[in-house]
Amino acid sequence: MSQLHSVIGFAILLCAGCTKTANIPPADLTLTSFERGASHLLTARFTSTVDLQHAFNDYEKSNQLSPTLICSLNRDLDFSSEHTIDIRAEGRVTAISETRPHHTFSSELVFYYTQPNGTQRDLNDYEAIRPLLASQAAIPCKVRITAYGYEAYYTNTLLIPSRLMTGQMPR
């Protein structure tokens, strides 16, 4: 059994070395609006200097998974794929306009709140999240894009004013 574990461990080490860093330029994001959408989820609209829907295809000739907007609600700035932000908002990024040089996107956000004991509060528990937002001027967000064989790509930070976010939350 230990020989099998050694082989598996060696294979993991080999595969870990297989991931490449994508040659995608850093994308600057600019918030254009933040409002409650038709599905009653809070929706961020923003522009990007990189076409987030086709970044890996444009720069690496590789397919990618759907981009995700991730916002840290508890001042946790570790956006790496090896780490999960316990109190966050995230949503799939969809294209609204792909006119160059600024592509426009939106993301309907779902709010997650994992307590210190590991249990999850109800999704979109705004009453638990509102006090965290009130203590901050802005909420940092990044778009993450993944593709097979590549390290996750992250955009530059988008700051959403916390007042704007709390103002759109249902009471």
What would you call each of these model-derived segments?
Residues 9-12:
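Hydrophobic helical h-region of N-terminal Sec-dependent signal peptides
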Residues 1-7:
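Bacterial N-terminal signal peptides that target proteins for export
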Residues 19-171:
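Non-catalytic macromolecular-recognition regions in eukaryotic signaling proteins
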